């Protein structure tokens, strides 16, 4: 018998940033390592991942990180995590690992252990075992995971729909799911993204007919945007390209490499004669395909709309086709993009989130999964809290006792001892790491506050040069301001700023000339000038002090 703890470091009461931890006695299994996008378009945050302090502290217990599929919400943070936990093996299907590796630098590739899994092949860890099962999603080779423990199976669904038309690498193995359910499921962690949607997601996840109508009604160039790694949508577009004998022009080296590799591996099907070059980009017959790597959605399209792309310029008779319905987390970005398209006089077409759905489980899909699994405990994950709650209501309607439906927030622990819920109030500390551009660092709320300060109150930079040996001031202090005051009208204020800065610097040097504490100088200048500026202007600019020795 075992003590099992289940909790999320990310993914609860939010869309994206999925990372779920199952601790079985002294063994830890981590499921997914995702990111989410920031919905605030003004603060320069490209994506967000969860903190992993718990995993770092317990790194020797981790048996592996198990990735369900190759979308950012599930694998987008794996490179950042492995920078801190390079010894932890990562498990995934061939395609999932291939996509994940795109974010690895050469050093990380060398020191990371990636283990390719096959659906329906058990991975043994002694008294525990992992069993992956194929599920249907918008990308090939998506899986759910069954973690076999001495007290029963714990199932994490990942993202899924039930769609009997899907074949090959998109097909759900419903027989294997039913078999697991008959053996007995202790706890089912099931996605909640579309728990509020009635019926099955299929066929509303398939938009080939809509794409066909757009192409049929458009005589001019079409610029189509796709989300990264949405293979199913790309194939729908390719099918219509082939049918209408248009040329597809793929923008950007990363997207070109991804598509070429997918065609080589059989994940996408397209006659290469249909792939155009930059010479075809101005053609009325062209369909230009645009996507983004791991940064804010629509970044490449936005660059084109602003005239910053050297290969393509938006024209009034162009049609911009956003091929994915919007969802919580990117609504602001979508609205901004639609406005920018309208300002340029081009036509904008987007999918309605009411009529068209992503490949996530709706109410009937969830009901089928619950009936197949028949779990003792039901743990809604992956989605806003209201959707988790609705997901729980669906389970209750199907006969799962309300006390066995687990509604949690990130860090809240479900503890099962000998298969029974202890109603633990334990909470694992978790927070967010905000990633800015290509830097893999914790920006934190302080930097966001700085950015707000810059926008509202401007910046003042004080620079000063000291003699390396005597510590005498050789130059400055010089004052540079941006967005704070009108320099020509504020000479007295600037002179007083220089005087105050010089006094603070000299006082610090006199206090300890042998070992000057430059950090203290910067802090003291910021504190004194901050009070002075507020007294004089009622503003609080960002203050930066630069002291150099020569």
Residue ranges and their predicted role:
Residues 60, 128, 182-183, 283, ...:
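Structured loop/turn residues at beta-strand edges in well-structured enzyme cores
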Residues 104, 395, 533:
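Conserved hydrophobic residues forming the short capping helix/wall of the S-adenosyl-L-methionine
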Residues 1-66, 71-279, 299-310, 332-334:
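His/Asp/Glu-rich metal-coordinating catalytic cores
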Residues 14, 139, 282, 454-456, ...:
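Solvent-exposed loop and beta-edge segments used for protein-protein assembly and interaction
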Residues 516-522, 526-550:
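C-terminal tails and terminal domains of large nucleic-acid-associated
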Residues 197-323, 327-352, 356-374, 379-493, ...:
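Hard-cation-handling environments
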Residues 118, 409, 539-543:
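Short Gly/Ser/Thr- and Asp/Glu-enriched loop/turn motifs at secondary-structure junctions
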């Amino acid at each position: 018998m075992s003590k099992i703890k289940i909790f999320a470091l990310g993914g609860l009461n939010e869309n994206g940033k999925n990372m779920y931890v199952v601790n079985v006695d002294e063994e830890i299994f981590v499921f997914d390592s995702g990111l989410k996008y920031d919905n605030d378009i003004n603060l320069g945050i490209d994506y967000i991942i969860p903190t992993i302090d718990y995993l770092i502290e317990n790194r020797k217990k981790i048996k592996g990180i198990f990735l369900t599929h190759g979308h950012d919400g599930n694998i987008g943070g794996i490179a950042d995590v492995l920078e801190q936990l390079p010894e932890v093996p990562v498990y995934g299907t061939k395609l999932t690992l291939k996509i994940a590796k795109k974010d690895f630098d050469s050093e990380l590739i060398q020191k990371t252990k990636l283990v390719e899994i096959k659906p329906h092949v058990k991975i043994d860890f002694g008294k525990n075992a992992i069993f992956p099962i194929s599920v249907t999603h918008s990308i090939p080779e998506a899986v759910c995971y069954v973690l076999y423990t001495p007290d029963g199976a714990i199932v994490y669904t990942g993202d899924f729909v039930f769609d009997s038309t899907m074949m090959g690498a998109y097909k759900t193995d419903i027989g294997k799911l039913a078999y697991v359910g008959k053996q007995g499921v202790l706890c089912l962690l099931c996605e909640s993204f579309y728990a509020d949607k009635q019926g099955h997601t299929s066929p509303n996840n398939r938009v080939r007919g809509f794409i066909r109508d757009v192409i049929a009604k458009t005589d001019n160039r079409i610029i189509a945007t796709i989300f990264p790694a949405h293979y199913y949508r790309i194939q729908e577009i390719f099918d219509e390209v082939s049918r209408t004998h248009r040329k597809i022009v793929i923008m950007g080296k990363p997207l070109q490499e991804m598509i070429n590799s997918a065609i080589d591996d059989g994940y996408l099907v397209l006659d290469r004669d249909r792939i155009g070059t930059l010479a075809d980009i101005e053609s009325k017959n062209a369909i230009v395909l645009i996507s983004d790597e791991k940064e804010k959605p629509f970044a490449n399209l936005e660059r084109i709309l602003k005239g910053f792309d050297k290969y393509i310029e938006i024209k009034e008779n162009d049609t911009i086709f956003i091929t994915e319905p919007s969802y919580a987390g990117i609504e602001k970005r979508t609205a901004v993009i639609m406005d920018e398209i309208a300002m340029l006089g081009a036509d904008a077409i987007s999918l309605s989130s009411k009529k068209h759905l992503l490949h996530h489980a709706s109410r009937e899909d969830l009901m089928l999964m619950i009936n197949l699994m028949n779990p003792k405990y039901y743990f809604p994950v992956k989605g806003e809290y209201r959707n988790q709650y609705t997901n729980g209501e669906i389970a209750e309607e199907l006969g799962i006792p309300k006390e066995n439906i687990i509604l949690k927030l990130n860090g809240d622990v479900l503890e099962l001892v000998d298969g029974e819920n202890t109603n633990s109030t334990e909470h694992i500390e978790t927070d967010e790491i905000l990633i800015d551009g290509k830097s893999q660092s914790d920006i934190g709320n302080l930097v966001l506050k700085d950015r707000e300060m810059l926008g509202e109150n401007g910046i003042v930079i004080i620079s000063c040069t000291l003699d390396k040996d005597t510590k005498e001031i050789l130059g400055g202090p010089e004052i540079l301001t941006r967005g704070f005051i009108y320099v020509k009208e504020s000479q007295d204020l600037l002179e007083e700023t220089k005087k105050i800065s010089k006094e603070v610097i000299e006082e610090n040097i006199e206090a300890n000339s042998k070992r000057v504490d430059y950090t203290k100088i910067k802090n003291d200048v910021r504190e004194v000038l901050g009070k002075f500026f507020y007294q004089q202007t009622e503003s609080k600019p960002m203050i930066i002090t630069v002291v150099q020795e020569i």
